[in-house]
A protein has these predicted regions:
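Short amphipathic alpha-helical surface micro-motifs
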Residues: 121, 136-140, 180-184, 191-192, ...
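Intrinsic disorder
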Residues: 2, 22-25, 150, 166, ...
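Homeobox/homeodomain signature
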Residues: 128-130, 177, 219
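Extracellular GAIN/GPS-associated region
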Residues: 1-170
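Hydrophobic alpha-helical transmembrane segments corresponding to the first two to three helices
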Residues: 193, 202-207, 211-252
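A generic "cationic amphipathic patch" detector
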Residues: 18, 61, 185, 213-214
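Proteolytic-maturation and junctional protease-sensitive modules
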Residues: 147-212
């Protein structure tokens, strides 16, 4: 069943055939919920002795864990350890008698090709703004219930290609399944912990999370890589013109 969800997610042509945004976003949201439910359905048969199972498809990684003994923090990571989510146990009231179940999910998706999710934040930006959703999503659910954290926050790490953006260029977002939109209330971008290839977020609840780049359309247009590439291409074009002109002059 996880493989079926993976195939659906990877069907770029199929997503592009859904022209109604609300239907497309609802379908995407249903996939996220379906994957979580798969994890809890699987763990319903687990004995509670700290068992961990990992399921990996082309673009979805599902991690399920049951545990009684509580460490200070439980972390889950993507298959390449590039994306991480850490849950502080001090922020949640666990029952010593019941088995605690964690379901964590990692998604790789090319949203610029499939448009599975909106590229804007609810009530703040619009589809016309120059925003882009990072192609990695992270999800976590505990005991299949709504968890609101107060004393400590969930920590998320997203690795990505180098970006040259100010703080306004990266926003930590979470998926609002009720509104079928990205929201940022309750999530904060950590400028101190983040780097050019790393975005760190802190959030006060559990759901599916992502990162929105170039949130205000303020990306630096003079990125050194793009500048170098443009210089090389322009130089080659100029050289080609000179060679062509010389060839034409010699053949007259």
């Amino acid at each position: 069943m996880l493989e079926s969800a993976s195939v659906m997610q990877d069907s770029v042509i199929g997503w592009n055939e859904i022209h109604d945004d609300s239907i497309r976003y609802q379908t995407s949201s249903n996939i996220l919920t379906f994957v979580d439910n798969l994890g809890f359905l699987y763990t319903s048969e687990f004995p509670c002795f700290g068992k961990i199972e990992v399921f990996q498809t082309k673009n979805i990684r599902l991690i399920v864990r049951t545990s009684v003994a509580m460490e200070e923090t439980t972390c889950f990571s993507s298959h390449d350890d590039q994306n991480v989510i850490c849950f502080p146990h001090s922020a949640f009231q666990f029952s010593k008698l019941n088995c605690t179940t964690f379901v964590s999910s990692f998604y790789s998706e090319s949203n610029d090709r499939s448009s599975m999710f909106p590229n804007y934040i609810s009530n703040e930006t619009s589809a016309e703004d120059n925003s882009n959703l990072h192609d990695q999503l992270i999800g976590l659910s505990v005991d299949n219930q709504t968890v609101k954290l107060e004393s400590s926050l969930v920590r998320l790490e997203f690795r990505h290609p180098e970006v040259d953006l100010a703080e306004a260029g990266r926003v930590c977002v979470w998926w609002d399944s009720a509104g079928l939109a990205w929201a940022r209330a309750g999530c904060q971008f950590s400028e101190e912990e983040s780097e050019a290839t790393l975005t760190v977020c802190h959030c006060d609840h559990l759901t599916n999370f992502g990162v929105m780049f170039d949130y205000q359309g303020e990306a630096d247009p003079h990125h050194p890589v793009f500048t170098l590439l443009s210089t090389i291409l322009l130089s080659l074009s100029a050289l080609s013109i000179l060679v062509t002109q010389a060839f034409l002059a010699l053949t007259k």
